[in-house]
Amino acid sequence: MSIPKTQYFEARPEVGSRPRTVRLHLADLDLQLQADRGVFGSKGVDLGTLVLLREAPLPPAEGEILDLGCGYGPIAVTLARRAPGAHVWAGDVNERAVELARANAAAAEASNVTAATPDQVPVGLRFEAIYSNPPVRVGKAPLHRLLMDWLPRLKPGAAAYLVVQRNLGSDSLAAWLAEQGFSVARLRSKKGYRVLEVRAAS
């Protein structure tokens, strides 16, 4: 039975829990992560996430970093392991995802991760970088609201790195972000995905 895509973006997924272990293999890391039904990528780390982690620049060594829409935490845990002097926020509306991200960070000895729902992130907090495999399947309007809630919280000179499948609108999203006043660059294109670098226009 397939799980509706919207399940991933609800606070409490209705689908029953069925935990499983998935592997995240990168050149510098090899991790076993706990995933579950009702959380994005539950059958294995999503290809877009892998493209982002392999192609985006390394995270800043210090400061606050956000994994927006963290799922069970593959991006957040990787960022934390790559930048042990930084503090990584793993943010998601899905409470099951947040619990998994917290557990996976602990298992990976990434004590510099805080897994949280959006309302648990301090309002005045600003980020040195944002990394995200954003939930494009929620639809344009909810996606645009999500990005406009968080991208303005970048510090001056900081960047967000978004991975979006080309056939799911990476180029139209880049154009829309530019219309909102952001500076957008297509950083990489690989395996049907684009990595976008988004900065506040100077």
Protein language model annotation of sequence segments:
Residues 1-27, 37-42:
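N-terminal auxiliary segments of SAM/dcSAM-dependent transferases
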Residues 35-54:
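Conserved SAM-binding loop and adjacent beta-strand
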Residues 48-132:
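Conserved SAM/SAH cofactor-binding pocket of Class I
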Residues 92-95, 142, 165:
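Short beta->alpha hinge that forms the Motif I/post-I loop of the SAM-binding pocket
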Residues 144-156:
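A short glycine-rich, Lys/Arg-flanked "PGG" loop and its adjoining helix->strand segment in the class I
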Residues 165-182:
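Conserved class I S-adenosyl-L-methionine
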Residues 189-202:
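Core SAM-dependent methyltransferase catalytic element
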